[in-house]
Amino acid sequence: MKPMLFAILLATAAPALADTLYTNANGYTLDAKGTLQRFATLVVADSGPQQGRVKATLKAGAALPAGTRIDMQGATLWPGLIDAHGHVMRLGELKLVVNLRDTASIAEAQARIKAGIPAVGWIMGRGWNQERWYENGKLVGRFPTAAELDAVTGDRPAAMSRVDGHALWVNNAAMTAAGITKDTPDPDGGQIIRDAAGNPSGVFVDKAMALVARAIPADDDARLDLVLTKSLETMAEVGLTGAHDAGMDKDTWDRYVRFAKAGKLTARIYAMAGGPENRKAIAPNGPIPWSINDLVAMQAMKLVSDGALGSRGAYLIAPYEDMPSTRGLEILKPEQLKSLVTDASRDGFQVNVHAIGDQANRSTMDAFAAVPPAERIARRHRNEHAQIVDMADLGRFASLNVIASMQPTHATSDKGMAEARLGEARLKGAYAWQQIKTSGAQLALGSDFPVEPPDPMFGIHAAVTRQSRDGLPAGGWRPWEKLSMLDAFAGFTTWAARAGHAEAKVGTLEPGKWADFITLERDPFTAPPGDLWKIKVTATWLGGKQVFKRK
């Protein structure tokens, strides 16, 4: 028999190896009861109707089935991590504009802007935070001005988004392009920061940002595809196999679907339509369940009830401690919020409301209370951020079956500013993860990327230690609100999966679920808590396919 014919007959006669076995792993997953389970081998189906899904996890010493074996050499293996609140396109955009994150002074921000000026078009940037700027050893604290931006941009229009996306710093050329003058009124739910003479000084807060944004040229398809690609690369690098996109439009949804169909979407996206208009444009016939190999879903609508604490847009019950002339910005009036929530809920959608200030949180919970109880349970409505909650309202998360979607690194980044803005009394219900969990409510954890870095190990570190990455303060900030390592792990896996109506598909490595998993360079369950943020993901798999490997 000729060698080639023999090889063909042998290949035909021998059964194909239908599974891949990831052996010698230091594996962790939760089970359906939330109990931590350990395993040494992960079995993934490579063909048939279960292709890309988990077939089994096996303890050390268990008999191994037939299949292709990959020795993990003792690497720690976790389910893929899920960020319950991020901004996918903004994350990729940060790679393509001037990055002002971590600038320590106005001068440093100016230097970065000057170095990053593109050849043509508007000069765009993101990430500044006046609460991190110092001059001569003193906190600047004030907003930057158009004149300070003019100094490095000249007559080219420039717009720099604050780190939280709730304020825009622009130069005079940008205001001219947008037709902004002294006579331009503040819009409802927004504020134009002005000088002593009443002239716009260069910063636009919350809904006032739209006055300038309308003049910024739209990106073309090629650039937006690049933005999404950059975001997906970043997510895979930090072990995110899923993200809940907190507010997007139809164009973005269509882009996700196109990428998913082309096999280019390397993370599962649970999309929240940005407001009622986008909800109706994307899903006129009702929620879109998980589809295209469970890569995309659009079952939720995002609403914004107030602004952010850093720009004093968070809407408070009482005035700000450090600026008694304001209580913040009420972006949606209570009756308007209630109407939007109940209408979308009636149409079958989960409603996820951004609420930071205690008054915004109260109004948000009042709106959820207007939804019939059985409907609330089915929809799994969410309070996004739940950052400053009056003590009288903390128990309402559990009683109303509202998920608290919270971001641990917000607490560790905001701690000093929060003390100045709020005072001690209001801090009792601020960033209150443990109190909300102990009340019987469900949490879901995320980062709010790119407001905070997307690395979920940063979030797990913040949840467990209540410290910033420099180890401060000793013992943690308001340490009674710390979460256990197990809860932090659940927050970025099973809790986040349930918050996206995906607990039957992802979040654990149980049989039948997608084989979304990661390996890490160290075991977070045995590492010192202060080192958690340093642990790097070494590889990421989505549906059994490797989408990232650290070099």
Where are these regions (language model features)?
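Sec-dependent signal peptide recognition
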Residues: 1-7
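N-terminal signal peptide c-region/cleavage motif recognized by signal peptidases
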Residues: 13-14
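Divalent metal-binding segments
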Residues: 19-24, 28, 34-39, 43-45, ...
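Acidic (Asp/Glu)-rich catalytic clusters
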Residues: 260-263, 287-296, 397-401
